[in-house]
Structures are given as structure tokens and as C-alpha cells.
Design a protein with these regions (language model features):
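Hydrophobic alpha-helix immediately C-terminal to the catalytic Tyr-X-X-X-Lys motif of short-chain
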Residues: 7, 11, 15, 45, ...
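Flexible, glycine-rich beta-alpha linker
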Residues: 24-42
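Active-site Tyr-X1-5-Lys
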Residues: 1-24, 50-51
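Short-chain dehydrogenase/reductase
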Residues: 1-9, 39-43, 65-66, 96
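Short, cationic motifs built from Arg/Lys/His that form the positively charged side of catalytic pockets
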Residues: 5, 27, 34, 64, ...
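Conserved hydrophobic/aromatic "anchor" residues
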Residues: 1, 15, 29-32, 66, ...
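Active-site micro-motifs of SAM-dependent methyltransferase domains
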Residues: 17, 30-33, 47, 62
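C-terminal substrate-binding subdomain of Rossmann-fold SDR/epimerase-dehydratase oxidoreductases
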Residues: 43, 49-161
């Protein structure tokens, strides 16, 4: 998976150099929102919370940089208005949270005592333990993450419930 991403970026850079094409690559970190699919961790938790206070997850100590969909859309708008040369932009909130911390936030928002059942067999051996975005380049174009994690999680709960 990671290899195909790198290959795609190398191919894009080659096209830029060979054909003088303006190309912008957007690396989106852990995007979430109210209409996200349940195979992603945040909507998965919300769906499980609808039926029970027991949440079944894999590795709850993995840390991810969660970014709300409206911030991603705003990043695309800015990037599309600034395509010049070859650029790679990272889109993320620049802060990581563990899955356990996300569950604690949902516990507070829902008012339910959450019981986490972690199954380490669901953990992928190649998973990175801590992922944090560096959005410095994108911020130079005037972008910033506007949706706090707490507000974003609340929006997800309100839509899914």
C-alpha cells in the first residue's frame, strides 16, 4: 500500500519534470466525518455506541492524526487555487490521539461508561504506532484546521444517532 503511494508520487514528479506539468499531491491523514464508512475507526465506534457501551477494537494505543472532512475540503480548495510546479501537501490537524483517547472523548460526549474490548489479533504488524501530520507547507498558503476534535466527534455522534 505505502509502496504504491510512493510509486505514484515518483510518477507524478517525473511527469512534472518531463512535461512541465503543474502537479499537486495531497496526503490526507485520518479523515473522518458524519458520513464516513464504518470500516474507519471513528464511525465504527459511533455505530457500536448506538447499540451498546461495549466497544470492540484492535490496538487502542495506536496514535493517529484525525482531520475533519470540512478541513480537508477547505485544503483542496486552497491547493486547487495554488497549483504551480510540483508540490506535496500534508493535510492533518498536526496532533495525534490514541484510539483509547478517542473512546474517552466519546464516553464524555455520550454520557455512557464505555467498556473497551481490545483484540490485538486485529492489529496489523506493519502499523505505525504514532502518526502526526506536518502541514507547514499547506499553512503557508493560508490553510489551517478549524474543526476541533471534540466538535468533530460531536457532529459524528449527532448524525449517526
Amino acid at each position: 500500500y505505502a509502496g504504491s503511494k510512493i510509486a505514484g508520487e515518483i510518477l507524478c514528479e517525473s511527469y512534472h519534470k518531463q512535461f512541465n506539468m503543474d502537479i499537486s499531491i495531497v496526503r490526507i491523514f485520518s479523515v473522518y466525518g458524519p458520513e464516513s464508512n464504518n470500516h474507519l475507526v471513528i464511525p465504527n465506534i459511533v455505530t457500536q455506541l448506538k447499540n451498546s457501551n461495549i466497544i470492540k477494537l484492535g490496538n487502542i494505543n495506536s496514535r493517529r492524526d484525525f482531520i475533519f472532512i470540512s478541513d480537508v475540503i477547505n485544503a483542496f480548495r486552497i491547493i486547487l487555487n495554488n497549483i504551480n510546479g510540483f508540490n506535496v501537501y500534508n493535510v492533518g490537524a498536526e496532533k495525534s490521539y490514541s484510539i483509547k483517547e478517542i473512546c474517552k472523548k466519546f464516553e464524555k460526549l455520550s454520557g455512557k461508561k464505555i467498556i473497551i474490548k481490545s483484540n490485538l489479533k486485529q492489529t496489523r504488524k506493519f502499523d505505525v504506532k504514532n502518526i502526526v501530520c506536518d502541514a507547514t507547507k499547506l499553512k503557508k498558503l493560508g490553510w489551517k484546521s478549524k474543526m476541533s476534535l471534540d466538535k468533530g466527534l460531536k457532529k459524528c455522534m449527532n448524525i449517526k444517532n
